[in-house]
Amino acid sequence: MRQQQMRNIGIMAHVDAGKTTTTERMLFYTGKIHRMGEIDDGATTMDWMVQEQERGITIQSAATTVRWREVDITIIDTPGHVDFTAEVERALRVLDGVVVVLCAVGRVQPQTETVWYQADRYDIPRVCFVNKMDRIGADFFSVLDQVHNKFGIDAVALQIPIGSGTSFEGVIDLITMKEIFWDAASSGEQMEYRPIQSARIAQAREAREKMLDVISIYSDEVTECVLAGEHVPVQLLHAEIRKAVRERRYVPFLCGSSRHNLGVQPLLDAVVEYLPAPQERKAVEGFHVQKKEPVFIAPTAEGPLLALVFKIQYEREAGLLCYVRMYSGKLRTGDSIVNIGKKKRERVYRILRMHSNKSETVECIQAGDIAVIVGLKSAQTGDSVGDGSCPVVLESMHFPEPVISVSLEPMDASSRDKLQETLGILSREDPTFSVREDAETGQLLISGMGELHLDVLTTRMREDFNVQVRVGKPHVTYRESIRKTVERTLRVQRVIGGKEYMAGLTLRVEARKRGAGNEFFCQVKELRGTVCTAHTAPAEIIGAVEHAIRGAWDGGIQSGYPCVDVGVHLLSVEYQELTSSPFIFEAAAVQAFGEACVAAEPYVLEPIMSVELSCAQENVGDVMNVIIQRGGIILGMDSKHGRELVHAQAPMKKMFGFSTDVRSASRGGASFTMRFSHFESCA
């Protein structure tokens, strides 16, 4: 019953669509805060980091819980900037519903598409809120059309705006057929419902008919009412929309202006009415590590304990905070739990509910809850934890590869150890941040999703960890892969410390589909040796080979860049009990892998970026020339409100300093977004 009174939602959008402002209003109207902060003042509740307040953007996802109409709503506010898309990915993995905030002027923007497809991957129901209806050029219906055309799903207006731009003053609710207005003197807390004015009744009836047309496609009861010419009851509409949203038949749309305190309470109503409670979602799929088979876990508090760690955050006093989503069972302070993948047992010191960067200690959480555990020293993002009675590993998360690197060194030698510790914490927090040492120069290299991403991280090193560092110029992070399939058999004999060691194995390396990732397959059918029979090689030997291959992927083939999309099959093993050991098999595996990959025609890949650029019509030729001169390809153009939108792709290695050239070519009148698209063979 408690789960029915819960919602776990995310607020997601393209940068500057008004996502954090919308969340701030939600906190105010639910009574969670008593004064609304503004982004321009660096005073919003969910943007608590100094870097967020200084830059006016969300960098880290932040969680809070509010209460609306007797329902507890856990809200995760996520970044809108492409450099921090990992924060969106891990939030979506554990959410039951999403509010997508769209700008009424900008409409569907690049990061809107990214988060939409991320939500599709996890099959998450959503409602949409068209914000900034007060802006000049706002067009509610164009946003709906663009969503329908881009994503192939019906966009159903549950409201229509009264006016737009500077004349926007309220909405018409098509469910109740009432006009809604907000009192500015009460900061929008007081709402007034009025009959629809005669001048607007025809438009409202037409919009309601369109809404009912879509709803009736998926509801026999609504169809019967419409055909009989009867009034469709409000509660029936709520129930049928809720069912259709849960099944992702269509997406309901609302509108408003969060900055001017218009439209947020109906959005909260929509979250309660239409987005699913935890137990209304499908049973979560996992993999039983003992039975070696997929299993489905029902979201019930009476089941075995099972939770997913979806975020790690360092806190100076508490240490590592592990954000978890509870999928089954109950967890209490002091309980002993098992990290299922790592087979490590640890004790829960404290359980916290977060309100941005503040916390409240609780004694118990259960299925459906999102909370923080303190005390898990070995946990990483994507780990599954349980009580040990049900050893099930849940699906983890997919994170994009870092595409840009900078060299890093401490300002003084005494800070070297502290820098290493800091990098360890940051890389544990952020799965898209990696650290490695250049094999040729010995330089320390850090890699991330973009210049802003790395700038934020190096600023945190200085300000949060008091580590002064010298940062080199950014350069592109390349990858290596192979074109052919090659087998290699290798037998290694070495004498170490007067003792002879032997290892023999056969590997096959193969090129995988772009984006498929690296994968290790153990296909040992025959094990040759003086004591072994088929399938009797010790598990530590197979594990040593896999461990060595995973390390070899990171080390690259010829150029030292990490490997992508390379499959490795272990076909056979020659093992002798007295002369074979894991370390000699690791050496053999690395050598065999390297020789096979060299023969498999290795090549280097570079990151290609998607660019969307907006400029005045008179500047479009000059702006396109800037892209073409940097090796870019123009994919298409659109016109919007007298401005031209240029869609292009370009190699990242040629995009450093792009913003300066674009400003010059457009005389300061252009803006652009750039995000990673894919890796492609270097020309």
From Swiss-Prot:
The keyword Protein biosynthesis applies. SUPFAM superfamilies: EF-G C-terminal domain-like (SSF54980), P-loop containing nucleoside triphosphate hydrolases (SSF52540), Ribosomal protein S5 domain 2-like (SSF54211), Translation proteins (SSF50447). One of its GO terms (molecular function) is GTPase activity. GTP binds at residues 13-20, 77-81, 131-134. InterPro entries: EFG_II, EFG_III, EFG_III/V, EFG_V, EFG_V-like, EFTu-like_2, G_TR_CS, P-loop_NTPase. One of its GO terms (biological process) is ribosome disassembly. Residues 4-279 form the tr-type G domain. Keywords: Cytoplasm, Elongation factor, GTP-binding, Nucleotide-binding, Protein biosynthesis. GO terms for cellular component: cytoplasm. It is found in: Cytoplasm. Belongs to the TRAFAC class translation factor GTPase superfamily. Classic translation factor GTPase family. EF-G/EF-2 subfamily. NCBIfam families: EF-G, small_GTP. Catalyzes the GTP-dependent ribosomal translocation step during translation elongation. During this step, the ribosome changes from the pre-translocational (PRE) to the post-translocational (POST) state as the newly formed A-site-bound peptidyl-tRNA and P-site-bound deacylated tRNA move to the P and E sites, respectively. Catalyzes the coordinated movement of the two tRNA molecules, the mRNA and conformational changes in the ribosome. This is Elongation factor G 2. It comes from Treponema pallidum (strain Nichols).
